[in-house]
Structures are given as C-alpha cells and as structure tokens.
Design a protein with these regions (language model features):
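C-terminal motif of bacterial Sec signal peptides marking the signal peptidase cleavage site
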Residues: 20-24
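Hydrophobic helical h-region of N-terminal Sec-dependent signal peptides
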Residues: 12-18
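A residue-level marker of the well-folded mature domains of exported/periplasmic proteins
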Residues: 26-379
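Bacterial N-terminal signal peptides that target proteins for export
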Residues: 2-12
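Intrinsic disorder/low-complexity detector
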Residues: 6-8, 19, 374
C-alpha cells in the first residue's frame, strides 16, 4: 500500500470525524482515513515487522455511557499499552452499511474489531475477501481462518445484580428492559432472575423488549411501562442509562448494563455488569504483532477480569453487599455455576436436570425463559 502524505491524511481523517459528528445515529459514515500506512498482515507463524494498523466498528457513540463507551475505553487502554493509534467508526447500523464500512477499513488496516452481534455475517463476508487481515467480532459465533470471536460471561454479573434486586424489592415485582430477544439478552435475563430467586423465591420478573441497542427515548418508555405495572426494581440490557434515570424519577431502584452508571442516579442505583475490554484488546493485537494470533472463540469472565461488577449504589445495605461478595467469590473460584439444575422454564418444562450444569455452548444458544419470568420470546 502506498503511503499518503501526512497533511492529506490528517485532513481526510478530520473530515471523516466531522462527518461522523454531524450525522449522529442516523447513518454510519465512511471509514476514517488511516493515520499511517497499513502494513500487510503477516502469517500467524511470523512476527509482524511493524506495529499493525487497527480499526474498530461501533454500534453507538463512544459517549453512550454504556456498551460502546466501554469498548472505546478498551481501545484507549490498548493504544496506551502498545503505543498504537487506532481508528474507529461510530453509529454503524447492523445493515449493509456495516459491510461497506468494514470493507473500507479492511483495505487500510491489519486488524478490524467489529463490536456488535449484528455485524457477524457482514464481518464474515469481508473476511473472505481479505485473507491477510485479522477480524475479531464481539458476541458472535461464526469464525474463519482469519476471523475470531470474543465475548464474556456477563451473565455471571447479571446473576449478582439479581441478588441485589431480589433483596431490594418491596413487592417482589422486578422489571427487565431487554434490547433484542436474542440469546445474549435471554441468558442475561435468566441469570438476573435466578440470582433474584436465590435470595427471594417469590420474585417475578416482567420483561419488555425494545428492539434497539441504543435509543434512550424508547428505553425510557419501556422502563416507565414496567414501573406502571408495579415493578419497583429494574435492570436494563441496553446501552444507555435511560432506564436508571426513569426509575430514579419514580423513586425506584435500577441498574444498567455494560458500564458503571452510578453517576446518573447514585441513590437509586443497584449495580450491574461491567465490561473490561482493554486487556483482551492488548492480548489480541500483541498476538498479531508476535505472529502467534490464531482464530478462536474467546470467552472471558469474572475470573480473568473481562467481566466485572459495578460499585454498589449509595443505598445498598452492607448485608446485601456481603451476600453478593460471597456469591462473587464462589463464581470466580468455580464453586458456583449460574446455570446449574434443577431449572425449569416459564412454561413448566424442566430444562436443566438436578445437578446438571449447562455448557457454555448451551448457554450461548439459550432460547427459553426461566420460571419466574413473565413474558415471551417474540418469534
């Protein structure tokens, strides 16, 4: 690849960033120009001669306060640790636009991270056209020789969040704002419910699906609908703090997802799962630099620090904190597996037998709701 003049490159990059800021969530922009010439990716058996060029594709804005924010914090961590400046494109819809942008990034980068489930097939398509580029897709399950996946057992932290919710409710009615009825959201909803039931067998969890990852207005409306139905504690599998903010206005407790959201309503905050992507990004990019990278389906968790639990809100009692910390220690040690039988679905069918522990593959393919969840999975 020919190296572009620094002045021209900087101008192009600035123009792209300005375009991204203007269009916001309406439409993804062209991929940003590279700040240095991209080197050809080397075979996995030979170390890279130069530091690789890296790009990220984001579903939302880095300022969403949740999922994309945490990925962007991981990018910044990787840049600091490895001395690499990475490009990113934000607000990329899970549509043909994604494939176009991933393709453009692959033309000028050695490593492309695509950070949302809906990018899976688009990433796979582009990977087939650029065999010398490494692609890493978050939360998916399809791989290729030059494409791996990565995600974590965030359901472990959802279970712990459920313990807090189960202890803080006064009427045993919990609410859950879910993005899409896909396995990733379903197993987190189920884990949250099981955690709550472990300390309060009488709780019920009502779920509302928003069919969006990031739309604060829609998320807020879903939260209000749950509060109107009587829920006094909420958790959201969404990318913004809108659920927490809506709950706080009603004097209810709530937790968010992906990031520490306590600053938005510290007196109404529970806790929630938090992603720590930075160390993984360092590991993956370093492997490419060392020539040791190989395609894999990486799944982290609380034990390796990819998944964490946010600090507790101001009003969480010490005895509740201790319950959570004790369960957390058991999860990290392996003594506590979230999906251990007996577990029945909300139709009365036994899905996990007494003493049985679901494998990771079974968890990732979950398409049923546990007993206690009031709602259905839309078809």
């Amino acid at each position: 690849m020919k190296k572009r003049g620094q002045f021209i490159t900087s101008c192009l990059a600035l123009m792209v960033l300005m375009t991204v800021a203007l269009v916001g969530c309406a439409k993804a922009t062209e991929a940003p120009a590279t700040t240095t010439a991209a080197t050809e990716a080397t075979a996995t058996t030979e170390p890279a001669a130069k530091k690789p060029t890296v790009a990220f594709v984001y579903i939302g804005p880095p300022g969403d306060g949740g999922y994309t924010y945490q990925h962007d914090q991981g990018r910044l961590y990787m840049e600091k640790e490895l001395g690499i400046k990475a490009d990113f494109v934000e607000n990329v819809p899970e549509s043909a636009d994604a494939e176009r942008i991933i393709t453009e990034l692959a033309q000028s980068h050695d490593i492309v991270f695509t950070t949302s489930f809906g990018y899976m097939d688009f990433t796979l398509n582009v990977a087939g056209k650029f065999p010398n580029v490494k692609f890493l897709h978050a939360s998916g399950y399809k791989t290729a020789e030059n494409m791996g996946t990565y995600f974590g057992k965030n359901y472990q932290a959802s279970y712990l969040s459920g313990i807090v919710a189960g202890k803080m409710t006064k009427n045993n009615q919990l609410g859950y704002v879910g993005a899409f009825p896909i396995s990733e959201v379903i197993y987190n909803l189920n884990a949250f419910t099981l955690g709550a039931q472990s300390v309060n067998p009488d709780v019920k969890v009502n779920v509302v699906w928003t069919n969006t990852w990031y739309d604060p207005t829609t998320e807020r409306q879903a939260a209000i609908s749950l509060l109107d139905k009587g829920a006094d504690v909420l958790l959201a599998y969404q990318d913004s703090p809108a659920t927490l903010q809506a709950a706080a206005e009603r004097g209810a407790f709530a937790g968010g997802n992906d990031s520490d959201m306590s600053k938005y309503a510290p007196d109404n905050y529970l806790t929630n799962p938090v992603w720590n992507w930075g160390p993984y990004y360092v590991k993956a990019v370093q492997a490419v630099m060392d020539g040791t990278w190989k395609s894999e389906q990486y799944s982290g968790g609380m034990a390796d620090g990819m998944v964490e639990l946010a600090p507790f809100g101001n009003k969480i009692p010490d005895d509740v904190k201790k319950l959570v910390e004790d369960a957390k220690a058991k999860i990290i040690s392996g003594e506590l597996e979230v999906f251990t039988g007996p577990i029945s679905d909300n139709q009365g069918n036994v899905k996990v037998q007494e003493g049985q522990k679901l494998t990771l593959e079974e968890v990732l393919g979950m398409n049923w709701l546990v007993k206690g969840v009031e709602g259905t999975i839309p078809q």
